[in-house]
Amino acid sequence: MAAVSGVRWLTRALVSAGNPGAWRGLSTSAAAHAASRSQAEDVRVEGSFPVTMLPGDGVGPELMHAVKEVFKAAAVPVEFQEHHLSEVQNMASEEKLEQVLSSMKENKVAIIGKIHTPMEYKGELASYDMRLRRKLDLFANVVHVKSLPGYMTRHNNLDLVIIREQTEGECSSLEHESARGVIECLKIVTRAKSQRIAKFAFDYATKKGRSKVIAVHKANIMKLGDGLFLQCCEEVAELYPKIKFETMIIDNCCMQLVQNPYQFDVLVMPNLYGNIIDNLAAGLVGGAGVVPGESYSAEYAVFETGARHPFAQAVGRNIANPTAMLLSASNMLRHLNLEYHSSMIADAVKKVIKVGKVRTRDMGGYSTTTDFIKSVIGHLHPHGS
């Protein structure tokens, strides 16, 4: 795992920085934090972390530019291996897909933009984005929807997590014309994958100190498919007696999120429902530009925006909001045990928003993407100093 190799690198960096005895007696997290401080003083101590970067479509390249500029200013010891894959810019092929997969498998960690999927059917049902996630078995998508201090919305002080299974369900690309004018779309639900995502959700809740998990479903109508998903969640819930478990039908969940989102803590759900709820919940705290996301398999971690939108109409206009991507990049650094740099960047982004002088159009301001990046860089400073 990249995180493990990162800790080893941090150990060597700490010793090289003149603290040969500092590692002894420290926990892994404390040692990583201390080592990360030494990196801030000399990021060239010993190499850097390789990370796959996939800018994607729309404003993706502009958001990745923001990440690279902020990382450079913060002296983050990360080396990006950039690849380009697009179905709308004639940059998609099996060869390019394999190159991206090879890079991700080698590095274990990636940061990606939205790979836009054309509406038109051109002979292949599964998009490159979907194929990428399946081949890496990125079964768990996690979107942390949290209000940003200083930015007022209809609902404030929100803090909820949406976890969805993203390798099966309605988005399985299994469609066919059974008779002329009749299309059948198959929804796949398996016990193994339903149990896996349920366990992931309860493990996440336990690790993060959360108190409640709600399974979102439509088992009243899809009695077998969603019924199996719900049954698996109920079985897994019995193994976690300290975590409160509830269930909620998807249509009621949408209404409750708008009326009283404070009742939610961790939500776990099948693929399509999660895709919809991610976007709805993002709208509660400011929209697609402010919510980070991440996807996990047993081996790989991919960091991205929580609400996946290419925002093609903003390309080249210097108006895209880098907040979500920068916060996602911060989460990536935490995954790599670069706690110092992670906190530095996240704190800088949040300070820019809290001060309120520099805000992009989607947040009611008039600042450009460049203005926002410069302001974030101006707020970088040693965490805790």
From Swiss-Prot:
<keyword id="KW-0496">Mitochondrion</keyword>
<dbReference type="GO" id="GO:0016616">
    <property type="term" value="F:oxidoreductase activity, acting on the CH-OH group of donors, NAD or NADP as acceptor"/>
</dbReference>
<keyword id="KW-0007">Acetylation</keyword>
<dbReference type="GO" id="GO:0005739">
    <property type="term" value="C:mitochondrion"/>
</dbReference>
<dbReference type="InterPro" id="IPR004434">
    <property type="entry name" value="Isocitrate_DH_NAD"/>
</dbReference>
<dbReference type="GO" id="GO:0000287">
    <property type="term" value="F:magnesium ion binding"/>
</dbReference>
<feature type="transit peptide" description="Mitochondrion">
    <location>
        <begin position="1"/>
        <end position="34"/>
    </location>
</feature>
<keyword id="KW-0809">Transit peptide</keyword>
<comment type="similarity">
    <text>Belongs to the isocitrate and isopropylmalate dehydrogenases family.</text>
</comment>
<dbReference type="GO" id="GO:0006102">
    <property type="term" value="P:isocitrate metabolic process"/>
</dbReference>
<dbReference type="InterPro" id="IPR024084">
    <property type="entry name" value="IsoPropMal-DH-like_dom"/>
</dbReference>
<dbReference type="GO" id="GO:0051287">
    <property type="term" value="F:NAD binding"/>
</dbReference>
<keyword id="KW-0816">Tricarboxylic acid cycle</keyword>
<comment type="subunit">
    <text>Heterooligomer of subunits alpha (IDH3A), beta (IDH3B), and gamma (IDH3G) in the apparent ratio of 2:1:1. The heterodimer containing one IDH3A and one IDH3B subunit and the heterodimer containing one IDH3A and one IDH3G subunit assemble into a heterotetramer (which contains two subunits of IDH3A, one of IDH3B and one of IDH3G) and further into the heterooctamer.</text>
</comment>
<dbReference type="InterPro" id="IPR019818">
    <property type="entry name" value="IsoCit/isopropylmalate_DH_CS"/>
</dbReference>
<protein>
    <recommendedName>
        <fullName>Isocitrate dehydrogenase [NAD] subunit beta, mitochondrial</fullName>
    </recommendedName>
</protein>
<comment type="function">
    <text>Plays a structural role to facilitate the assembly and ensure the full activity of the enzyme catalyzing the decarboxylation of isocitrate (ICT) into alpha-ketoglutarate. The heterodimer composed of the alpha (IDH3A) and beta (IDH3B) subunits and the heterodimer composed of the alpha (IDH3A) and gamma (IDH3G) subunits, have considerable basal activity but the full activity of the heterotetramer (containing two subunits of IDH3A, one of IDH3B and one of IDH3G) requires the assembly and cooperative function of both heterodimers.</text>
</comment>
<feature type="modified residue" description="N6-acetyllysine">
    <location>
        <position position="199"/>
    </location>
</feature>
<dbReference type="GO" id="GO:0006099">
    <property type="term" value="P:tricarboxylic acid cycle"/>
</dbReference>
<dbReference type="Pfam" id="PF00180">
    <property type="entry name" value="Iso_dh"/>
</dbReference>
